[in-house]
Amino acid sequence: MVDLQEKQCTIVKRNGMFVPFDRNRIFQALEAAFRDTRRIDDHMPLPEDLESSIRSITHQVVKEVVQKITDGQVVTVERIQDMVESQLYVNGLQDVARDYIVYRDDRKAHRKKSWQSLSVVRRCGTVVHFNPMKISAALEKAFRATDKTEGMTPSSVREEINALTQNIVAEIEECCPQQDRRIDIEKIQDIVEQQLMVVGHYAVAKNYILYREARARVRDNREEDGSTEKTIAEEAVEVLSKDGSTYTMTHSQLLAHLARACSRFPETTDAALLTDMAFANFYSGIKESEVVLACIMAARANIEKEPDYAFVAAELLLDVVYKEALGKSKYAEDLEQAHRDHFKRYIAEGDTYRLNAELKHLFDLDALADAMDLSRDLQFSYMGIQNLYDRYFNHHEGCRLETPQIFWMRVAMGLALNEQDKTSWAITFYNLLSTFRYTPATPTLFNSGMRHSQLSSCYLSTVQDNLVNIYKVIADNAMLSKWAGGIGNDWTAIRATGALIKGTNGRSQGVIPFIKVTNDTAVAVNQGGKRKGAVCVYLEVWHLDYEDFLELRKNTGDERRRAHDVNIASWIPDLFFKRLQQKGTWTLFSPDDVPGLHDAYGEEFERLYEEYERKVDTGEIRLFKKVEAEDLWRKMLSMLFETGHPWMTFKDPSNIRSAQDHKGVVRCSNLCTEILLNCSETETAVCNLGSINLVQHIVGDGLDEEKLSETISIAVRMLDNVIDINFYPTKEAKEANFAHRAIGLGVMGFQDALYKLDISYASQEAVEFADYSSELISYYAIQASCLLAKERGTYSSYKGSKWDRGLLPIDTIQLLANYRGEANLQMDTSSRKDWEPIRSLVKEHGMRHCQLMAIAPTATISNIIGVTQSIEPTYKHLFVKSNLSGEFTIPNVYLIEKLKKLGIWDADMLDDLKYFDGSLLEIERIPDHLKHIFLTAFEIEPEWIIECASRRQKWIDMGQSLNLYLAQPDGKKLSNMYLTAWKKGLKTTYYLRSSSATTVEKSFVDINKRGIQPRWMKNKSASAGIIVERAKKAPVCSLEEGCEACQ
């Protein structure tokens, strides 16, 4: 019988994940070892004495494992195998132990045997690295010649070539002894011939043989003439240019081009390698654009080995951008003058290109042109430039019109339109943006300086219980979504299924069918042609349709009652958690039977809710349902884990701590759960977002407070300008934004900042940094708003607000504590700075904005400037990134920098990272202190992430898009995690992510080397060379690659 202590133990698998410890696995491994050594067939029973020995050794190993875990040690699979080995010797079973050791040594030896260590002896005697791409290229040429292919090679042929190449590489590895990893080029070509015939490509094999004979004759003739064989630098292809003409490109010309792109990184990048890789994909008549793409793809493919290739790829793409926009290479001697001329021409002809017609009249274009610094292009990595190219640069008839610096200046000009000294402020804004200190949200980047300057990120609306308003809000969603806004809808007021419709004397079908219409509208109206609309639907947990609402995202059931494209979120009052703690019942109502309940919060909500429950008991309310709070909670957690929805958001802290409690109620959040503003039938709440890049403010071992203060002051001014410049798709949005002037200043690169400071996310130091950085941002953001109020006046609904009553965000924690009680609120309230000067400023000048701070996900803008998203921990240290231009692997540059300093960044380390899915825990060469600093999201206990969020929450006046991570969630862990989030004072949470969401691409990991074949198989299996596909993604954020509505 397994005791409780053993059941609670977890070990670390080879994929880096913690899993429950299972003694049966040890027993089974030992049984297989004994059968193999003693040659006992599987169908034969084990002798009693051997079975007894196996059980005894299993017990001894289990005891040692449990003791080590109890002592706080991390136990890996490899460590358990060491224990098994030791126990076999202790028990006198040397023969089994010996075979066990030999097997393990074989597996280690396989790790060193890889095509990456192979060398090729060329005909001239020189030795070069083996490059499988050369085989692919030769095969492609043979297939193209046989099939008389024109243009691009068909994908079916490429797949066939990939399979052949893999088989050929495996055969080559078998031919090369471990001691001398060299092979003759002729031998390689022989293997190619054989493999072509093995799979039945006789025509291709014939052409390949004839080609080899022809090349041999050419070489013989050269030798007779006394000439030497051409070097690879003399290879050439015919290239088809855009105008239809052709020209010859030689290997050496391409090498010169790539050498310029690599010139900034002579020690870490290899232009010759890129040239070989690119040339291997060329064919006669290749298009110019395909040549460029092949070069970029070659650099991109090497990013996982050397992060500097990301900047090489960026440089190559920049050259494309400059040629497209300016008609000149970025290496042109007169580039700066050409850039200035193009900028002035672009703005002057702006009417043609959808620019704001006023730009050319209101700004000194010469001064702006001179202010742009092209050297700042060098800050971009490949992903940043690719994102800008694919999504953000203005274009006309398929041609990009902007370079990175023109893009930043266009955004800056748009944000300076209402300034007195427009040119001076545009330059100030440009300098902040182009140095990556602050980045506005995606709608602002899309539309600032454009004809339709819809710059706002988030809209929140509430739906009234009548058809006219229902369809008005749906129509408003369409208009808001058209201009790239992300939307949060509150649907709690809609009467439930079965409620009486007095006008027709019929019965309502409830809220679900209307959410279905909302879903289909979001899909139908895309955001400026860039992606489908994005909506989150909120419902309070006492609504009678709430249980059906929970199942909206399920893949089974009646499709008429499913909404697969909208996001859904629960709006949860504190009373529900109190009932949950008391193991009490929870009553579901139809909103038309409980007037005022949705608008109430805190003690007033509890009073009304209990009054309506009494009416149920007396029979005054007939349409209701009583459920156990625990059962409903279990269903909420189950759906959250199964579908990723509904997100958990908390009604009472969102309202009790709201600065605008005098002007209404917060009824829901936005698309990404960070915005908390009042909305009503006459007001659609609006928020404008932007994020500070924390990395740019790290100096030495801390934050540069003066620089951060300056950044915040300018950023708040830009966000304030958005409100006045903005194009408003609806009247309700315009009136709300002008009345309350909400802005959402957030952060990104939190994890990068921790790396720079050598701090682990799973540490008290990280908690303190989250606290201190948030306090500074809150301090200087409030100061900036006060100074703007002095300059421009307070927002119109300022009187009566918490600001006006002398309450800052830190002060409102006590209000929440007064309602909840100390047991249900565990928030730190300490501070480092003297807040009296800020209190005096607020009292003297008031506030320019009703709300100031919110932390958005920043999924796309963080990619542009090359930092980690928002406040997110590192997901993996090696992960596959997808964008409109395809997939590529991205490594953690901070980790690689550390590993390089230790001298342990090499091909084996990269292979280990891939094998262990981007985790470090089981890579023995990496020191423990680095493993602690570089824990990934699923290796960090949720308590650390929640505590960091709680420290931020005490300073910010709205919310934060907070993803939570569990490697292997179960009901108890999930429940504890969300209850902890509630008790720590969080206002909202976002996605729950599980470790099955994604794995690192293993296409280039030899799975036979890793022992994925049956445990005790002595010979290589037929399936050993197959490619491991990435696991199917579990439900996670569909907006992962670019929540363009909120960042």
Swiss-Prot record:
Amino-acid positions noted as binding substrate in the UniProt annotation, renumbered to this chain? 442, 457-458, 486, 670-674, 857-861
The reaction(s) catalysed by this protein are:
a 2'-deoxyribonucleoside 5'-diphosphate + [thioredoxin]-disulfide + H2O = a ribonucleoside 5'-diphosphate + [thioredoxin]-dithiol
Q: Which Gene3D superfamilies match?
A: 3.20.70.20
For this chain, the annotated S-S bridges are: 458-687
Which UniProt keywords are given for this protein, alphabetically ordered? Answer: Allosteric enzyme, ATP-binding, Deoxyribonucleotide synthesis, Disulfide bond, Nucleotide-binding, Oxidoreductase, Repeat
The record's active-site residues are: 670 (proton acceptor), 672 (cysteine radical intermediate), 674 (proton acceptor)
Positions of the ATP-cone domain = 9-111, 118-219, 237-327
A single Gene Ontology MF term assigned here is:
ATP binding
Q: What is the regulation of this protein's activity?
A: Under complex allosteric control mediated by deoxynucleoside triphosphates and ATP binding. The type of nucleotide bound at the specificity site determines substrate preference. It seems probable that ATP makes the enzyme reduce CDP and UDP, dGTP favors ADP reduction and dTTP favors GDP reduction.
Look up the record and give one Gene Ontology term from the biological process aspect: deoxyribonucleotide biosynthetic process
SUPFAM superfamilies, per the entry: PFL-like glycyl radical enzymes (SSF51998), R1 subunit of ribonucleotide reductase, N-terminal domain (SSF48168)
Allosteric effector binding (site feature) positions: 465, 495
Site Important for electron transfer — annotated at 990-991
Q: Which GO terms describe its cellular component?
A: ribonucleoside-diphosphate reductase complex
Q: Name the EC number(s).
A: 1.17.4.1
Q: How does it assemble?
A: Tetramer of two alpha and two beta subunits.
Question: Family per UniProt?
Answer: Belongs to the ribonucleoside diphosphate reductase large chain family.
Annotated NCBIfam families: NrdE_NrdA, PRK07207.1, PRK12365.1
Q: Which PANTHER family match?
A: RIBONUCLEOSIDE-DIPHOSPHATE REDUCTASE LARGE CHAIN, RIBONUCLEOSIDE-DIPHOSPHATE REDUCTASE LARGE SUBUNIT
Name the chain's protein: Ribonucleoside-diphosphate reductase subunit alpha
Source species: Chlamydia trachomatis serovar D (strain ATCC VR-885 / DSM 19411 / UW-3/Cx)
